[in-house]
Amino acid sequence: MSDVIIVGAGPTGLMLAGELRLQGVDVVVVDKDEEPTQFVRALGIHVRSIEIMEQRGLLDKFLAHGRKYPLGGFFAGISKPAPAHLDTAHGYVLGIPQPEIDRILAEHATEVGADIQRGKRVVAIRQDTDNVAAELSDGTTLHARYLVGCDGGRSTVRKLRSTSVFPASRTSADTLIGEMDVTMPADELAAVVAEIRETHKRFGVGPAGNGAFRVVVPAAEVADGRATPTTLDDIKQQLLAIAGTDFGVHSPRWLSRFGDATRLADDYRRDRVFLAGDAAHIHPPMGGQGLNLGVQDAFNLGWKLAAEINGWAPVGLLDTYESERRPVAADVLDNTRAQAELISTAAGPQAVRRLISELMEFEDVKRYLTEKITAISIRYDFGEGDDLLGRRLRNIALTRGNLYDLMRSGRGLLLDQGGQLSVDGWSDRADHIVDTSTELEAPAVLLRPDGHVAWIGDAQAELDTQLSTWFGRSARDRA
């Protein structure tokens, strides 16, 4: 029997597998596909996800296979330069196709001991007070203490949960998308696309790597369902209707369509079954937030689930996964809905778009929207206190090295600039680092394994209270 079954070997599931294995949790990942998908659902990662990869020592691998791009233009495609200053060492978006992201995360998960089994579909889920069982399409059954559905927007796990609710907003527009070859010369193509995008923001034809082009074009009508596959002829017809040319598209690698509806699961946990990533929330791909949202779900859930399995989680810790992450997803759904409205060709939304564009001339407005899209403005509600409380702490330089290099183990961390504090009683769960930084005013900060600030201060009694809140009873009390 495993500790955790993860259903879905995409970025969310693979990130979660790596996080759990860092804490010694026995993990099996199952995925319905025989081979890793080459379907490029996402093209890069934003600032907070870049920081997460750095916290786990994976960033160099991502940088080796990606390309840095400026952060401007990520809110509804409004072309404005990035803010002059962001509270991060990584003020860029890293362009890297999802298959490459999946490959790096799968290699990491395997290296730390995760068992990844492909070509196995979950067909039934049963759970009792102690365990959960997943019946697979090959007739076998896996048993574990917990199961996490990371199997995408059409999640089987979500559907198999009893009385699961996944309400949807109304779809008002559909978009066709795919990767294929084109014959139109590059200069001519760029000129045509630039002209069309003056009025059609849901339109694009551009390089996707490996000689292919990604084509995005409004669909002729909203589909009643997603059962009918998109064809190359569908895309050609819409290109001709909107651009007056089909760009000579041919040899599609993959084709799909998406709508602008949003959906958010009514709960992220049903006893021993959790949802993460697109299984819990879906939205239009505005601002490139979807993959990042799922990776950050996994980063939040991983250490908490490991704490429960390893026997030191305080009461209610697992419940904070939903209370922290669901509001974040709701905010992403809101901002993608807003962006979807702003790319409409109707006169009203276009007037609002022009107004937003004017407002983005103000540095504070531009920074606010950029921090929202890149997820570095997230602040979990830990109660009243310093503005840093509940936020992630960016990588800061220390006298000896830097902060994120000290977080690769996935443990909690007390950064103590005065050297007067102690984590005695919690040293099996949190590291105590005595060091100083010119970039941090607080005398000491307690960081959760996901890098969010759980406490700021210099009083040992207050620190002990927060250590108990996030890391359970001290070893002295458990003895």
Curated annotation (Swiss-Prot):
Sorted alphabetically, which SUPFAM superfamilies does this protein's record hold? FAD/NAD(P)-binding domain
Catalyses:
rifampicin + NADPH + O2 = rifampicin para-naphthoquinone carboxamide + NADP(+) + H2O + H(+); rifampicin + NADH + O2 = rifampicin para-naphthoquinone carboxamide + NAD(+) + H2O + H(+)
**What EC number(s) are associated with this protein in UniProt?**
1.14.13.211
As cofactor, the record names: FAD
Supply the alphabetized keyword list: FAD, Flavoprotein, Monooxygenase, Nucleotide-binding, Oxidoreductase
Quick one: which residues bind FAD? 12, 31-32, 41, 98, 122, 156, 278, 291-292
Specify whether Cell cycle is a keyword of the entry.
no
Please give the superkingdom of this protein's source: Bacteria
Q: Report the family membership.
A: Belongs to the rifampicin monooxygenase family.
According to its UniProt entry, the function of this protein is described as:
Monooxygenase that can modify rifampicin, thereby inactivating its antibiotic activity.
The name this protein carries in UniProt is Rifampicin monooxygenase
Annotated source species: Rhodococcus hoagii
The gene it comes from is iri
